[in-house]
């Protein structure tokens, strides 16, 4: 009933109350749902033969990511983390400039992302896979890896945990250069 009213108010031509029915009517899927649903929605979409962009955090375990990437590759499907920054022309221009050496040798990169939230909220709920790492690390680490690569020699994590959720995490990647 509320879906009918919403569709009428905003001119939505098609809407579904079953995910399977939705999948029958699209060519690709953009998963931007609560963290705990990313794996299931992405897997269902791939198994229905759909290309998928999935918001961060992409998956909550490496095993889930490998499983879905392998399936997508075998079935010739596109599966990407929906990191808009990675494809932003200005960010890629910055990466090109840095790698060209025009500013000299890069010896240190610092990125920081933060968000003010008040409990209770998904970001502070361990049951909903909240926490600083799940919320912000993919974007911050993507910038460093784009600039310096994946061949870091060591890493350290420093976190402040409250109620089972990291409310602050600092990641230090050490590179051999």
For each feature predicted by the language model, list its residue ranges.
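Predominantly a Rossmann-like dinucleotide-binding segment in NAD(P)-dependent oxidoreductases
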Residues: 85-153
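Residue-level signal for alpha-helix termini/capping positions
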Residues: 23, 46-47, 73, 99-102, ...
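Rossmann-fold dehydrogenase core element
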Residues: 66-84, 105-109
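Beta-loop-alpha module in the N-terminal Rossmann-like domain of NAD(P)-dependent dehydrogenases
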Residues: 5, 10-71
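Histidine-centered beta-alpha loop that forms part of the nucleotide-sugar donor binding/catalytic region
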Residues: 34, 57, 83-84, 114
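Contiguous beta-strand/loop segments that form the cofactor/metal-binding neighborhood of enzyme cores
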Residues: 135, 141-177
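Short loop/edge segments at beta-strand edges and connector loops
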Residues: 16-17, 54, 81-83, 156-159
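Residues embedded in well-ordered beta-strands within globular domains across many folds
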Residues: 16, 30, 107-110, 156
């Amino acid at each position: 009933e509320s879906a009918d009213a919403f569709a009428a108010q905003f001119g939505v031509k098609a809407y579904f109350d079953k995910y399977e029915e939705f999948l029958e009517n699209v060519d690709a899927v953009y998963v931007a749902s609560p963290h705990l649903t990313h794996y299931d929605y992405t897997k269902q979409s791939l198994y229905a033969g759909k290309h998928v962009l999935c918001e961060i955090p992409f998956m909550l375990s490496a095993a889930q990511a490998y499983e879905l990437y392998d399936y997508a590759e075998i079935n010739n499907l596109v599966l990407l983390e929906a990191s808009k920054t990675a494809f932003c022309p200005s960010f890629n221009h910055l990466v090109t400039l840095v790698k060209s050496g025009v500013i000299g040798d890069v010896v240190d990169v610092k990125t920081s992302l933060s968000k003010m939230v008040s409990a209770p909220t998904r970001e502070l709920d361990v049951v909903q896979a909240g926490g600083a790492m799940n919320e912000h690390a993919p974007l911050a680490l993507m910038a460093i890896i784009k600039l310096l690569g994946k061949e870091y020699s060591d890493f350290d994590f420093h976190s402040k945990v409250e109620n089972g959720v990291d409310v602050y995490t600092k990641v230090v990647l050490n590179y051999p250069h």
